[in-house]
């Protein structure tokens, strides 16, 4: 395994099997994206109220959302990157709303597991620096997440 993933399930609604699939899926994505071995990621499964508060406090949007990610290795303006080959990178945290994932799975007509996988990959790509603020960025990121999910076998 490339990634060290720390799961926290505040909802007690995600099974060990589902966490194992997410772990395998993100390790597959990490391999495709050439992520260094030992990289660390935190994944929290929360309810809508918890993600609403996070979304309000960090993004200024007072409403629940499906996934939020916080990259830890991002450099701010004027910051210098400190590289140490012996320290595995701390990629950051992915926070997923379980009620939103269930709602969206039903809305899009696919399984809860597929939606959970989609949200995990989406958050993971954000940790790696991908974004969708412009049309071009969106095209690249969404194509990448679709490719990862399809190649892994987690299709709609």
Curated annotation (Swiss-Prot):
It comes from the Bacteria. The keyword Metal-binding applies. InterPro entries: MetalPrtase_cat_dom_sf_prd (IPR023091), YbeY (IPR002036), YbeY_CS (IPR020549). Its cofactor is Zn(2+). Binds 1 zinc ion. Zn(2+) binds at residues 122, 126, 132. The keyword Hydrolase applies. One of its GO terms (cellular component) is cytoplasm. Its EC number is 3.1.-.-. It is found in: Cytoplasm. Keywords: Cytoplasm, Endonuclease, Hydrolase, Metal-binding, Nuclease, Ribosome biogenesis, rRNA processing, Zinc. One of its GO terms (molecular function) is metalloendopeptidase activity. One of its GO terms (biological process) is rRNA processing. Belongs to the endoribonuclease YbeY family. Single strand-specific metallo-endoribonuclease involved in late-stage 70S ribosome quality control and in maturation of the 3' terminus of the 16S rRNA. This is Endoribonuclease YbeY. The lineage of its organism: Bacteria, Bacillati, Bacillota, Bacilli, Bacillales. The gene is ybeY.
